[in-house]
Regions:
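Hydrophobic transmembrane alpha-helices and their immediate loop junctions
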Residues: 1-207
Length: 207
């Protein structure tokens, strides 16, 4: 019994650390690329992090408890993006900001996959193999058009500003909707073929 509990504890710790390394670097990388794209490609003044969000986030602000739990038990999940100041980030800027979340996850997938491929440490391999797999999962999940995922903000970026308030109100109900899909096992059934595809792509990169 103690062996089983130790194994569960180790897997839970590995999953939690993996979640941290796919979520926190993703958001900081997103902000870096966002500022870079504004200053280089759009020739616009770069926005500071505290100007993008209504409230300056801390590292734990990106952790979504439900997203963490689903990653641990169902092999897919999501992160929490603090509320954006839609008065400053809208239209073209919102599209870029949302798309860069997906791109950041793909970059982390490539980085973590390369690390796990080159390392000789079994623990480092497990950590970054799972990090690569979950980063690719995050990039795909983010494209779902469900608030507050990036896919919904990509659509929102094409809508007039008057719909932004509606979006914020709808986000809460959409979270309840996602919980319902998980409880009814609909979301896991939808994700199952995607998880198999993601595992195959990850294995192709690493092995």
């Amino acid at each position: 019994m103690s062996v089983i509990l130790n194994s569960l504890a180790k897997n839970a710790l590995l999953g939690f650390i993996t979640y941290l390394i796919i979520v926190i670097p993703r958001e900081y990388l997103r902000l870096f690329l966002y500022n870079l794209s504004l200053s280089i490609f759009l020739k616009e003044k770069s926005e500071k992090e505290e100007e993008i969000y209504l409230k300056k986030p801390h590292f734990y602000s990106y952790i979504d408890p439900l997203g963490l739990i689903t990653f641990l038990f169902l092999d897919f999940g999501w992160s929490h993006t603090p509320v954006i100041d839609y008065r400053k980030v809208k239209g073209k800027l919102l599209f870029i900001f949302s798309l860069l979340g997906v791109i950041s996850s793909i970059l982390l997938f490539l980085i973590y996959g390369t690390i796990s491929r080159l390392t000789n440490s079994n623990y480092v391999f497990q950590l970054f193999y799972l990090g690569a797999k979950w980063s690719l999962t995050m990039s795909i999940i983010s494209l779902f058009p469900l608030p507050p995922l990036d896919g919904s903000r990509l659509i929102l970026s094409f809508l007039p500003s008057k719909y932004y308030e509606w979006y914020l109100k709808f986000s809460f109900y959409c979270i309840l909707f996602m919980i319902g899909l998980i409880v009814l096992w609909i979301f896991p059934m939808i994700m199952q073929p995607l998880i198999i595809f993601i595992s195959n792509v990850t294995n192709f990169l690493i092995f």
